[in-house]
Curated annotation (Swiss-Prot):
Cited function: Peptide chain release factor 2 directs the termination of translation in response to the peptide chain termination codons UGA and UAA.
Gene3D superfamilies linked to this entry: 3.30.160.20, 3.30.70.1660, Release factor
Keywords assigned: Cytoplasm, Methylation, Protein biosynthesis
Organism field: Beutenbergia cavernae (strain ATCC BAA-8 / DSM 12333 / CCUG 43141 / JCM 11478 / NBRC 16432 / NCIMB 13614 / HKI 0122)
Modified-residue entries (N5-methylglutamine), positions: 250
Gene Ontology molecular function terms on file: translation release factor activity, codon specific
Protein's name in the database: Peptide chain release factor 2
Modification comment: Methylated by PrmC. Methylation increases the termination efficiency of RF2.
GO CC list: cytoplasm
Gene symbol of the encoding locus: prfB
């Protein structure tokens, strides 16, 4: 069936106008002016961390505005291309228009998903922790596979990351790993990845070649900001120091530079060992602890709302995705039903479709809960 280009182009323009109304270009321009002024301050780089946040937010906000303008221009160009194909009755030009229509739909979908990230902390940078679960050495290996998957995803998108802590398992893989994704909206984007991930495969660590099911947990928290005012009394924490370790339990540092902070009232434990000094690891651990406490407060509030709605199960993140390598190959999200038959691509960071489906699914769930309490 021939593509109805006028209808498609009209629909694209309508969607873009809806996105524009939500995004508010005037507000973006005002934010760009504000950040540009901050970026021009002569003392900006006196605090490198704060300076990096300012420049990152400026670049991101400029990119948001540019994407709106670029999409509008691409739709105009597509309309011109379709007219040219009709005038010249050129099949090649028509095929080019079909291809461009597909690309614009994809770009529009990505931009539309961004408008769904309207949660209180969605615009924050993210701290991601991966922990091996049941499954022994296979689970530890799976945790390392997931770490590589997320770092590759960030690398492909040009997002800066920093690995804060890695705790290696004895035989292979990781007990746990924590890293930051230093870009605005990283939390809103990656929070749909939180939950239990399951791997099914023939174990490379089993001499009998048996199929093994293993698990890993992914936690995603918003990075704390100075304006959050999360005060932690010294009496509420216990700080332990130890030597950083590498694969197989080998010590990689001759000094006690690694830090473990335990928040006594909640039992939350944060370890950091990838910075060079104990002071740096302590500062990083405190920042992550504050972020986890911030998220815990939000989750407590969300639990109250769910109880009012008659939904006492806060389990959307549990058992969220299966990665099956044998006897067949399939990666499937158990919430959204989105699935692909190429696990290799997924483990190489090709997870945008899963994330987009998760964000849309989450918004649908929120709408249902809001309707139940209306």
């Amino acid at each position: 069936m021939a593509t109805d280009f006028p209808a498609e182009i009209s629909a694209l323009r309508g969607t873009l106008e809806q996105i524009t109304a939500v995004t508010d270009p005037d507000a973006l321009r005002a934010r760009i002016a504000e950040l540009s002024e901050a970026a021009a301050a002569p003392d900006l780089w006196d605090d490198p961390d704060a300076a990096q946040k300012v420049t990152s937010r400026l670049s991101h906000t400029q990119s948001e505005l540019e994407r709106l303008d670029t999409l509008r221009s691409r739709i105009d160009d597509l309309e011109t291309l379709v007219q040219l194909a009709a005038e010249e009755d050129d099949a090649d030009t028509l095929a080019e228009a079909e291809a461009e229509l597909t690309k614009i739909r994809t770009s529009m979908g990505e931009l539309e998903v961004r408008t769904l990230l309207a949660g209180e902390y969605d615009s924050r940078e993210a701290v991601v922790t991966i922990r091996s679960g049941a499954g022994g050495v296979d689970a530890a290996d799976f945790a390392e596979m997931l770490l590589r998957m997320y770092l590759r995803w960030a690398e492909r998108k040009g997002y800066p990351t920093q690995v804060l802590d890695t705790s290696y398992a004895e035989e292979a893989g990781l007990k746990s790993a924590t890293f930051e994704v230093k870009v605005p909206y990283a939390f809103g984007t990656l929070s749909v990845e939180a939950g239990t991930h399951r791997l099914v495969r023939i174990s490379p660590f089993d001499n009998q070649g048996r199929r093994q099911t293993s698990f890993a947990a992914v936690e995603v928290i918003p990075l704390i900001e100075q304006t959050d005012h999360i005060d932690i009394p010294e009496t509420d924490i216990r700080i332990d120091v130890f030597r950083s370790s590498g694969p197989g339990g080998q010590s990689v540092n001759t000094t006690d530079s690694a830090v473990r902070i335990t928040h006594l009232p909640t039992g939350i434990v944060v370890s950091m060992q990838n910075e060079k000094s104990q002071i740096q690891n302590r500062a990083a651990a405190m920042r992550v602890l504050q972020s986890r406490l911030l998220l815990a407060m939000q989750e407590e509030e969300n639990a109250k709302k769910k109880e009012l709605a008659g939904d006492v199960k806060a389990s959307w993140g549990d058992q969220m995705r299966s990665y099956v390598l044998q006897p067949y190959q399939m990666v499937k999200d158990l919430r959204t039903e989105h699935e692909v038959g190429n696990p290799s691509a997924v483990f190489d960071g090709d997870i945008d479709d899963f994330i987009e489906a998760g964000i849309r699914w989450r918004r649908q769930q929120q709408t249902v809960r809001e309707s139940a309490t209306a």
